[in-house]
Amino acid sequence: MLNRLRRPAALLLLALALPAAAATPPSPLKVMSFNVRTPADTAPGKRWMDRREALVTTIRQAHPAVMGTQELVKEQADYLASQLPDYRWFGEGRRGGDDDEHMGVFYDRKVVALEQSGNFWLSDTPDVAGSISWGNLFPRMVTWGLFRRVEDGRRFYLFNTHLPYRDEDEPRRVRGAQAIVAHLKTLPADIPVVVTGDFNSEPGGPTYAAFTGALTDARTQVAAPRGPKNTFHDFTGKATTELDWVLVRGFTARDFATVDARVDGILPSDHFPLVVELDWDAK
């Protein structure tokens, strides 16, 4: 009888002495940033009608959970949504309403759920749609979303923007970066953040420094990023400048790709998109 009582106790002690099984790490989050180029071009191969199927194919092959777009207009957004039925999108035109360019954010509703979303303008009056400050030619803005992943309930923010393009706009790009970073500082520190965009500035400059004081360039976290470093190619296929970045807080990139492939000979846009797989940092 005594031996029978001792046996369960011994098994319990043995179980306590064994190292705890390592928890399975969460699956990575796939994010895409894509300047889709407005439908303004009339030359064959650059026209929206000529390249829209290539753009859909590029997104479908990447299959991101979330995607920040730049230069998107509603005509393009509606077409993409019709061809990508698992995706939903949101965003407001930079002048307010549905007109003009959007910083549209797309998300796979089977992978993530949208909990909150909003917009703010990079100006002295960020809550005023279409507001312009600091000498910008056009309204500049951010569209953001708070997402919850369906499989495990993990939450994250995505912020998406497009900064001014002229060489002399660097001070205005810095002001925009500072405004975005100030906004990020108001968010809960335990919820990871991704910032996607066409920043119209290259790494190493003042705009990059303003961002990377609070965020990390995902490309720098990967030992061997795939594809070219530069992203803007003006429909030549040979990129000359690295204008598009993915910046993170609370994530570490495991894979980073600049997608330079043509689809049936067609370039989807004048920018190469970025596709990044992000691991969640341990809390």
What do the PLM-derived regions correspond to, one by one?
Residues 66-155, 258:
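Structured beta-strand-rich core segments of catalytic domains in phosphoester-bond hydrolases
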Residues 22-83, 94-101, 178, 279-283:
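N-terminal, active-site-proximal structural segment of metallo-dependent hydrolase catalytic domains
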Residues 89-108, 123-127, 133-139, 170, ...:
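Active site of divalent-metal-dependent phosphoester/diester hydrolases
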Residues 14-22:
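Hydrophobic h-region of N-terminal signal peptides that target proteins for export
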Residues 33-53, 122-138, 164-170, 236:
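Acidic/histidine-rich helix-loop elements
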Residues 28-41, 115-120, 144, 155-164:
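Active-site-proximal beta-strand elements of phosphoester/diester hydrolases
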Residues 1-12:
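Bacterial N-terminal signal peptides that target proteins for export
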Residues 141-161, 170-199, 207-211:
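His/acidic metal-ligating clusters that form di-metal
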